Amino acid sequence: MNLHEYQAKALLKKYGVSVQEGILARSAEEAVAAFEQLGGKFAVIKAQVHAGGRGKAGGVKVVKSKEEAADYANQLIGTNLVTYQTDANGQPVNSVLVCEDVYPVERELYLGAVVDRSSRRVTFMASTEGGVEIEKVAEETPEKIIKVEVDPLVGLQPFQAREVAFALGLKDKQIGQFVKLMAGAYQAFVENDFALFEINPLSVRENGDILAVDAKIGIDSNALYRLPEIAASRDKSQENERELKASEFELNYVALEGNIGCMVNGAGLAMATMDIIKLYGGQPANFLDVGGGATKERVIEAFKLILADTSVQGVLINIFGGIVRCDMIAEAIIAAVQEVNVTVPVVVRLEGNNAELGAKILDESGLKLTSANGLSDAAEKIVAAVKG
Protein backbone atom coordinates (compact mmCIF):
# COMPACT_ATOMS: atom_id res chain seq x y z
CA MET A 1 0.00 0.00 0.00
CA ASN A 2 1.38 3.40 -0.99
CA LEU A 3 0.91 6.70 0.80
CA HIS A 4 0.39 10.08 -0.80
CA GLU A 5 3.10 12.69 -0.34
CA TYR A 6 1.04 14.62 2.22
CA GLN A 7 0.42 11.43 4.22
CA ALA A 8 4.08 10.41 4.08
CA LYS A 9 5.23 13.84 5.26
CA ALA A 10 2.72 13.89 8.12
CA LEU A 11 3.90 10.46 9.28
CA LEU A 12 7.60 11.36 9.09
CA LYS A 13 6.97 14.64 10.91
CA LYS A 14 5.68 12.65 13.91
CA TYR A 15 9.16 11.12 14.13
CA GLY A 16 11.02 14.41 14.13
CA VAL A 17 11.79 14.62 10.41
CA SER A 18 11.82 18.21 9.13
CA VAL A 19 9.52 18.43 6.11
CA GLN A 20 8.39 21.09 3.68
CA GLU A 21 5.15 22.52 5.08
CA GLY A 22 2.05 22.01 2.98
CA ILE A 23 -1.74 22.19 3.10
CA LEU A 24 -4.02 19.73 1.30
CA ALA A 25 -6.63 21.19 -1.05
CA ARG A 26 -9.47 19.36 -2.77
CA SER A 27 -10.80 22.36 -4.70
CA ALA A 28 -9.60 25.63 -6.22
CA GLU A 29 -11.13 27.55 -3.30
CA GLU A 30 -9.20 25.45 -0.79
CA ALA A 31 -6.01 25.94 -2.85
CA VAL A 32 -6.44 29.74 -2.67
CA ALA A 33 -7.02 29.59 1.10
CA ALA A 34 -3.91 27.44 1.48
CA PHE A 35 -1.86 29.81 -0.68
CA GLU A 36 -2.85 32.78 1.49
CA GLN A 37 -2.22 30.82 4.68
CA LEU A 38 1.33 30.12 3.50
CA GLY A 39 2.07 33.82 3.06
CA GLY A 40 0.38 34.70 -0.22
CA LYS A 41 3.59 35.27 -2.21
CA PHE A 42 4.97 32.00 -3.58
CA ALA A 43 3.85 28.38 -3.28
CA VAL A 44 4.37 25.05 -4.99
CA ILE A 45 1.30 23.07 -6.02
CA LYS A 46 1.74 19.31 -6.33
CA ALA A 47 -0.74 16.77 -7.70
CA GLN A 48 -1.34 13.98 -5.18
CA VAL A 49 -1.06 10.70 -7.08
CA HIS A 50 0.68 7.39 -6.45
CA ALA A 51 3.29 7.87 -9.18
CA GLY A 52 6.68 9.40 -9.68
CA GLY A 53 7.66 11.78 -12.46
CA ARG A 54 4.98 14.32 -11.57
CA GLY A 55 7.14 17.33 -12.34
CA LYS A 56 7.92 16.31 -15.91
CA ALA A 57 4.25 15.46 -16.48
CA GLY A 58 2.99 18.88 -15.39
CA GLY A 59 1.90 17.79 -11.93
CA VAL A 60 4.12 20.26 -10.03
CA LYS A 61 4.16 24.03 -10.50
CA VAL A 62 5.31 27.17 -8.71
CA VAL A 63 2.51 29.75 -8.39
CA LYS A 64 2.94 33.44 -7.52
CA SER A 65 -0.63 34.61 -6.95
CA LYS A 66 -3.94 33.31 -5.65
CA GLU A 67 -5.31 33.50 -9.21
CA GLU A 68 -2.52 31.20 -10.43
CA ALA A 69 -3.15 28.87 -7.49
CA ALA A 70 -6.85 28.62 -8.33
CA ASP A 71 -6.21 28.19 -12.04
CA TYR A 72 -3.62 25.45 -11.61
CA ALA A 73 -5.68 23.59 -9.00
CA ASN A 74 -8.63 23.67 -11.41
CA GLN A 75 -6.42 22.26 -14.18
CA LEU A 76 -5.35 19.30 -12.03
CA ILE A 77 -8.21 18.31 -9.73
CA GLY A 78 -10.65 15.94 -11.39
CA THR A 79 -8.24 14.94 -14.17
CA ASN A 80 -5.87 12.02 -14.65
CA LEU A 81 -2.11 12.61 -14.54
CA VAL A 82 -0.05 10.49 -16.92
CA THR A 83 3.62 9.99 -15.98
CA TYR A 84 6.32 7.53 -17.00
CA GLN A 85 5.27 5.38 -14.01
CA THR A 86 1.57 5.13 -14.95
CA ASP A 87 -0.26 3.45 -17.80
CA ALA A 88 -1.84 5.42 -20.64
CA ASN A 89 -4.89 6.21 -18.50
CA GLY A 90 -2.83 7.83 -15.75
CA GLN A 91 -3.82 8.26 -12.10
CA PRO A 92 -6.79 10.35 -10.88
CA VAL A 93 -5.95 13.64 -9.17
CA ASN A 94 -8.42 14.10 -6.31
CA SER A 95 -6.38 16.66 -4.40
CA VAL A 96 -3.29 18.87 -4.54
CA LEU A 97 -0.74 19.75 -1.90
CA VAL A 98 -0.04 23.48 -1.63
CA CYS A 99 3.51 23.72 -0.26
CA GLU A 100 5.72 26.49 1.05
CA ASP A 101 8.34 27.68 -1.42
CA VAL A 102 11.73 26.56 -0.05
CA TYR A 103 13.80 27.56 -3.07
CA PRO A 104 16.48 28.49 -3.86
CA VAL A 105 18.45 25.68 -2.19
CA GLU A 106 22.18 25.04 -2.07
CA ARG A 107 22.06 21.30 -2.72
CA GLU A 108 19.65 18.43 -3.29
CA LEU A 109 20.41 15.04 -1.72
CA TYR A 110 18.72 11.64 -1.69
CA LEU A 111 17.86 9.38 1.24
CA GLY A 112 15.95 6.12 1.00
CA ALA A 113 15.58 2.72 2.63
CA VAL A 114 14.29 -0.74 1.73
CA VAL A 115 14.30 -4.20 3.26
CA ASP A 116 17.26 -5.88 1.55
CA ARG A 117 16.34 -9.52 0.96
CA SER A 118 19.94 -10.71 0.58
CA SER A 119 21.09 -9.28 3.93
CA ARG A 120 17.62 -9.54 5.53
CA ARG A 121 18.09 -6.08 7.01
CA VAL A 122 16.82 -2.56 6.52
CA THR A 123 19.31 -0.92 4.18
CA PHE A 124 19.62 2.84 3.81
CA MET A 125 20.79 4.43 0.58
CA ALA A 126 22.00 8.01 0.29
CA SER A 127 23.42 10.05 -2.54
CA THR A 128 24.61 13.55 -3.38
CA GLU A 129 22.56 13.23 -6.59
CA GLY A 130 19.15 14.25 -5.28
CA GLY A 131 16.26 15.37 -7.45
CA VAL A 132 16.72 12.60 -10.03
CA GLU A 133 15.58 8.97 -10.10
CA ILE A 134 17.85 6.82 -7.92
CA GLU A 135 17.61 4.07 -10.57
CA LYS A 136 19.32 6.42 -13.02
CA VAL A 137 22.08 7.18 -10.50
CA ALA A 138 22.56 3.45 -9.82
CA GLU A 139 22.91 2.78 -13.54
CA GLU A 140 25.15 5.70 -14.52
CA THR A 141 27.16 6.54 -11.38
CA PRO A 142 26.74 3.71 -8.84
CA GLU A 143 29.79 4.92 -6.90
CA LYS A 144 27.72 7.93 -5.77
CA ILE A 145 25.33 5.75 -3.76
CA ILE A 146 26.19 5.22 -0.08
CA LYS A 147 24.68 2.11 1.56
CA VAL A 148 24.24 1.34 5.26
CA GLU A 149 22.84 -1.93 6.63
CA VAL A 150 21.09 -1.73 10.01
CA ASP A 151 21.46 -4.56 12.52
CA PRO A 152 17.90 -5.26 13.72
CA LEU A 153 19.17 -6.27 17.18
CA VAL A 154 20.57 -2.81 17.98
CA GLY A 155 18.88 -0.57 15.40
CA LEU A 156 20.43 2.37 13.59
CA GLN A 157 23.44 3.67 15.49
CA PRO A 158 24.34 7.39 15.60
CA PHE A 159 27.80 6.71 14.21
CA GLN A 160 26.25 5.15 11.09
CA ALA A 161 24.16 8.25 10.45
CA ARG A 162 27.20 10.48 11.03
CA GLU A 163 29.24 8.47 8.52
CA VAL A 164 26.52 9.01 5.91
CA ALA A 165 26.41 12.73 6.75
CA PHE A 166 30.18 13.00 6.27
CA ALA A 167 29.98 11.10 2.96
CA LEU A 168 27.30 13.54 1.77
CA GLY A 169 29.56 16.47 2.55
CA LEU A 170 27.38 17.90 5.32
CA LYS A 171 28.99 20.19 7.88
CA ASP A 172 28.52 21.72 11.32
CA LYS A 173 24.85 21.85 12.45
CA GLN A 174 23.78 19.92 9.34
CA ILE A 175 25.38 16.75 10.71
CA GLY A 176 23.26 16.84 13.86
CA GLN A 177 20.13 17.59 11.82
CA PHE A 178 20.84 14.68 9.49
CA VAL A 179 21.49 12.23 12.35
CA LYS A 180 18.13 13.18 13.89
CA LEU A 181 16.38 12.88 10.53
CA MET A 182 17.87 9.48 9.68
CA ALA A 183 17.17 8.11 13.17
CA GLY A 184 13.56 9.29 12.95
CA ALA A 185 13.17 7.77 9.50
CA TYR A 186 14.46 4.40 10.75
CA GLN A 187 12.10 4.44 13.73
CA ALA A 188 9.19 5.26 11.43
CA PHE A 189 10.28 2.50 9.03
CA VAL A 190 10.31 -0.20 11.72
CA GLU A 191 7.25 0.86 13.71
CA ASN A 192 5.04 1.23 10.62
CA ASP A 193 6.22 -1.74 8.56
CA PHE A 194 7.57 0.22 5.61
CA ALA A 195 8.48 -1.70 2.49
CA LEU A 196 9.97 1.40 0.86
CA PHE A 197 10.95 4.86 2.00
CA GLU A 198 12.36 7.79 -0.01
CA ILE A 199 13.10 11.45 0.51
CA ASN A 200 13.94 12.88 -2.88
CA PRO A 201 15.00 15.58 -2.80
CA LEU A 202 16.39 16.11 0.67
CA SER A 203 17.27 19.77 0.29
CA VAL A 204 19.97 21.83 1.97
CA ARG A 205 18.57 25.36 2.22
CA GLU A 206 20.59 28.56 1.94
CA ASN A 207 20.41 28.98 5.74
CA GLY A 208 22.00 25.53 6.11
CA ASP A 209 18.90 23.68 7.32
CA ILE A 210 18.00 20.26 5.93
CA LEU A 211 14.44 19.69 4.73
CA ALA A 212 12.48 16.83 3.16
CA VAL A 213 10.89 18.44 0.10
CA ASP A 214 9.26 15.24 -1.16
CA ALA A 215 8.55 11.91 0.53
CA LYS A 216 7.47 8.51 -0.70
CA ILE A 217 6.42 5.62 1.54
CA GLY A 218 5.23 2.13 0.67
CA ILE A 219 3.68 0.04 3.46
CA ASP A 220 3.91 -3.76 3.61
CA SER A 221 0.31 -4.72 2.81
CA ASN A 222 0.67 -7.92 4.87
CA ALA A 223 1.06 -5.76 7.99
CA LEU A 224 -2.03 -3.58 7.53
CA TYR A 225 -4.00 -5.67 10.04
CA ARG A 226 -1.84 -4.18 12.81
CA LEU A 227 -1.78 -0.66 11.37
CA PRO A 228 -5.47 0.34 11.51
CA GLU A 229 -4.78 4.08 11.35
CA ILE A 230 -2.65 3.75 8.22
CA ALA A 231 -5.03 1.21 6.65
CA ALA A 232 -7.87 3.73 7.07
CA SER A 233 -5.93 6.25 4.96
CA ARG A 234 -5.73 3.92 1.95
CA ASP A 235 -6.70 5.68 -1.27
CA LYS A 236 -8.37 2.98 -3.33
CA SER A 237 -8.88 5.33 -6.28
CA GLN A 238 -5.14 5.06 -6.97
CA GLU A 239 -5.16 1.26 -7.20
CA ASN A 240 -5.93 -1.03 -10.11
CA GLU A 241 -9.63 -1.88 -9.82
CA ARG A 242 -9.10 -5.59 -10.50
CA GLU A 243 -6.16 -5.83 -8.09
CA LEU A 244 -8.28 -4.15 -5.42
CA LYS A 245 -11.14 -6.59 -6.00
CA ALA A 246 -8.68 -9.49 -5.83
CA SER A 247 -7.41 -8.41 -2.42
CA GLU A 248 -10.96 -8.62 -1.05
CA PHE A 249 -11.00 -12.34 -1.86
CA GLU A 250 -7.36 -12.96 -0.80
CA LEU A 251 -6.28 -13.49 -4.39
CA ASN A 252 -2.82 -12.45 -5.54
CA TYR A 253 -3.48 -10.61 -8.80
CA VAL A 254 -1.23 -8.36 -10.86
CA ALA A 255 -2.46 -6.91 -14.15
CA LEU A 256 -0.08 -7.21 -17.13
CA GLU A 257 -0.28 -6.10 -20.75
CA GLY A 258 -0.86 -9.37 -22.62
CA ASN A 259 -4.00 -11.13 -23.87
CA ILE A 260 -3.86 -14.59 -22.23
CA GLY A 261 -5.43 -14.73 -18.78
CA CYS A 262 -3.80 -17.06 -16.24
CA MET A 263 -5.30 -18.77 -13.20
CA VAL A 264 -2.81 -20.80 -11.18
CA ASN A 265 -2.41 -22.05 -7.61
CA GLY A 266 1.00 -21.18 -6.23
CA ALA A 267 3.25 -18.20 -7.01
CA GLY A 268 6.10 -20.32 -8.39
CA LEU A 269 3.81 -22.26 -10.70
CA ALA A 270 2.19 -18.98 -11.78
CA MET A 271 5.56 -17.54 -12.79
CA ALA A 272 6.48 -20.74 -14.62
CA THR A 273 3.11 -20.60 -16.43
CA MET A 274 3.74 -17.04 -17.59
CA ASP A 275 7.24 -18.00 -18.74
CA ILE A 276 6.03 -20.92 -20.83
CA ILE A 277 3.27 -18.82 -22.40
CA LYS A 278 5.94 -16.38 -23.57
CA LEU A 279 8.13 -19.30 -24.70
CA TYR A 280 5.36 -20.41 -27.06
CA GLY A 281 4.87 -16.88 -28.41
CA GLY A 282 2.03 -15.64 -26.22
CA GLN A 283 1.70 -12.74 -23.78
CA PRO A 284 0.21 -13.23 -20.28
CA ALA A 285 -2.48 -10.72 -19.31
CA ASN A 286 -2.05 -11.20 -15.59
CA PHE A 287 -0.43 -12.96 -12.67
CA LEU A 288 -3.15 -14.64 -10.62
CA ASP A 289 -2.46 -17.03 -7.74
CA VAL A 290 -5.61 -18.47 -6.15
CA GLY A 291 -3.53 -19.96 -3.32
CA GLY A 292 -3.00 -23.44 -1.96
CA GLY A 293 -6.27 -23.51 -0.04
CA ALA A 294 -8.50 -22.12 -2.77
CA THR A 295 -12.25 -22.40 -2.27
CA LYS A 296 -14.89 -22.75 -4.96
CA GLU A 297 -16.02 -19.16 -4.36
CA ARG A 298 -12.49 -17.77 -4.75
CA VAL A 299 -11.99 -19.65 -8.01
CA ILE A 300 -15.25 -18.20 -9.38
CA GLU A 301 -14.17 -14.69 -8.38
CA ALA A 302 -10.75 -15.29 -9.95
CA PHE A 303 -12.42 -16.21 -13.24
CA LYS A 304 -14.53 -13.06 -13.10
CA LEU A 305 -11.42 -10.96 -12.47
CA ILE A 306 -9.60 -12.39 -15.47
CA LEU A 307 -12.53 -11.85 -17.81
CA ALA A 308 -13.13 -8.32 -16.54
CA ASP A 309 -10.00 -7.42 -18.50
CA THR A 310 -11.29 -6.68 -22.00
CA SER A 311 -7.88 -7.43 -23.53
CA VAL A 312 -8.13 -11.11 -22.53
CA GLN A 313 -8.66 -13.31 -25.60
CA GLY A 314 -8.08 -16.67 -23.94
CA VAL A 315 -7.62 -18.23 -20.49
CA LEU A 316 -5.13 -20.84 -19.29
CA ILE A 317 -5.99 -22.57 -16.01
CA ASN A 318 -3.07 -24.48 -14.50
CA ILE A 319 -3.81 -26.27 -11.22
CA PHE A 320 -1.64 -28.66 -9.24
CA GLY A 321 -3.84 -30.43 -6.74
CA GLY A 322 -2.15 -30.71 -3.36
CA ILE A 323 -4.21 -29.11 -0.63
CA VAL A 324 -6.81 -28.05 -3.18
CA ARG A 325 -8.70 -30.85 -4.99
CA CYS A 326 -8.85 -30.81 -8.78
CA ASP A 327 -12.49 -31.96 -8.82
CA MET A 328 -13.46 -28.92 -6.72
CA ILE A 329 -11.55 -26.68 -9.13
CA ALA A 330 -13.34 -28.33 -12.06
CA GLU A 331 -16.74 -27.67 -10.50
CA ALA A 332 -15.78 -24.05 -9.82
CA ILE A 333 -14.59 -23.60 -13.42
CA ILE A 334 -17.89 -24.92 -14.75
CA ALA A 335 -19.88 -22.66 -12.40
CA ALA A 336 -17.81 -19.64 -13.41
CA VAL A 337 -18.08 -20.34 -17.15
CA GLN A 338 -21.85 -20.68 -16.83
CA GLU A 339 -22.23 -17.58 -14.65
CA VAL A 340 -19.94 -15.26 -16.63
CA ASN A 341 -20.94 -16.52 -20.08
CA VAL A 342 -17.39 -17.06 -21.30
CA THR A 343 -16.86 -16.54 -25.02
CA VAL A 344 -13.05 -16.87 -25.19
CA PRO A 345 -11.11 -20.16 -25.45
CA VAL A 346 -10.32 -21.83 -22.11
CA VAL A 347 -7.54 -24.41 -21.73
CA VAL A 348 -7.36 -26.37 -18.47
CA ARG A 349 -4.44 -28.39 -17.13
CA LEU A 350 -5.10 -30.36 -13.92
CA GLU A 351 -2.48 -32.45 -12.10
CA GLY A 352 -2.36 -34.07 -8.68
CA ASN A 353 -5.13 -34.63 -6.13
CA ASN A 354 -8.25 -35.99 -7.93
CA ALA A 355 -6.94 -34.80 -11.31
CA GLU A 356 -8.62 -37.64 -13.23
CA LEU A 357 -11.96 -36.96 -11.56
CA GLY A 358 -11.57 -33.26 -12.30
CA ALA A 359 -10.85 -33.95 -15.97
CA LYS A 360 -13.88 -36.24 -16.16
CA ILE A 361 -16.14 -33.55 -14.67
CA LEU A 362 -14.89 -31.03 -17.26
CA ASP A 363 -15.30 -33.47 -20.16
CA GLU A 364 -18.87 -34.30 -19.16
CA SER A 365 -19.87 -30.66 -18.63
CA GLY A 366 -20.77 -30.07 -22.27
CA LEU A 367 -18.91 -26.76 -22.21
CA LYS A 368 -16.23 -25.66 -24.65
CA LEU A 369 -13.25 -26.35 -22.40
CA THR A 370 -10.00 -27.74 -23.80
CA SER A 371 -8.06 -30.09 -21.52
CA ALA A 372 -4.26 -30.38 -21.67
CA ASN A 373 -1.95 -33.24 -20.75
CA GLY A 374 0.95 -31.12 -19.50
CA LEU A 375 2.20 -27.59 -19.11
CA SER A 376 3.81 -27.42 -22.55
CA ASP A 377 0.69 -28.85 -24.16
CA ALA A 378 -1.47 -26.31 -22.31
CA ALA A 379 0.67 -23.35 -23.37
CA GLU A 380 0.80 -24.51 -26.98
CA LYS A 381 -2.97 -24.95 -27.12
CA ILE A 382 -3.91 -21.58 -25.59
CA VAL A 383 -1.42 -19.64 -27.74
CA ALA A 384 -2.72 -21.37 -30.87
CA ALA A 385 -6.34 -20.71 -29.87
CA VAL A 386 -5.71 -17.00 -29.26
CA LYS A 387 -3.79 -16.55 -32.50
CA GLY A 388 -6.61 -18.31 -34.33
Curated annotation (Swiss-Prot):
Keyword Transmembrane helix in annotation: no
Positions annotated to bind substrate: 265, 322-324
Keyword match Transmembrane helix: no
Q: Which metal ions or organic cofactors does this protein require, according to UniProt?
A: Mg(2+)
Q: Name one Pfam family in it.
A: ATP-grasp_2
The residues covered by the ATP-grasp domain are 9-245
InterPro entries in the cross-refs? ATP-grasp, ATP-grasp_succ-CoA_synth-type, ATP_grasp_subdomain_1, Succ-CoA_synthase_bsu_CS, SUCC_ACL_C, Succ_CoA_ligase-like_bsu, Succinyl-CoA_synth-like
Which pathway, metabolic or otherwise, does it act in? Carbohydrate metabolism; tricarboxylic acid cycle; succinate from succinyl-CoA (ligase route): step 1/1
Q: Which reaction does it catalyse?
A: succinate + ATP + CoA = succinyl-CoA + ADP + phosphate; GTP + succinate + CoA = succinyl-CoA + GDP + phosphate
Q: Where does ATP bind?
A: 46, 53-55, 100, 103, 108
What is written in the cofactor note of this entry? Binds 1 Mg(2+) ion per subunit.
Quote one Gene Ontology molecular function term.
succinate-CoA ligase (GDP-forming) activity
Q: Where does Mg(2+) bind?
A: 200, 214
Give the Enzyme Commission number: 6.2.1.5
Q: Which GO BP annotation is one of this protein's?
A: succinyl-CoA metabolic process
Q: Which UniProt keywords apply?
A: ATP-binding, Ligase, Magnesium, Metal-binding, Nucleotide-binding, Tricarboxylic acid cycle
What is the purpose of this protein? Succinyl-CoA synthetase functions in the citric acid cycle (TCA), coupling the hydrolysis of succinyl-CoA to the synthesis of either ATP or GTP and thus represents the only step of substrate-level phosphorylation in the TCA. The beta subunit provides nucleotide specificity of the enzyme and binds the substrate succinate, while the binding sites for coenzyme A and phosphate are found in the alpha subunit.
User: What is the similarity comment for this entry?
Assistant: Belongs to the succinate/malate CoA ligase beta subunit family.
What's the subunit arrangement here? Heterotetramer of two alpha and two beta subunits.
Tell me the protein's name.
Succinate--CoA ligase [ADP-forming] subunit beta
Starting at the broadest rank, the lineage of the source organism is:
Bacteria, Pseudomonadati, Pseudomonadota, Gammaproteobacteria, Moraxellales
From the UniProt record, report the name of the gene that encodes this protein: sucC
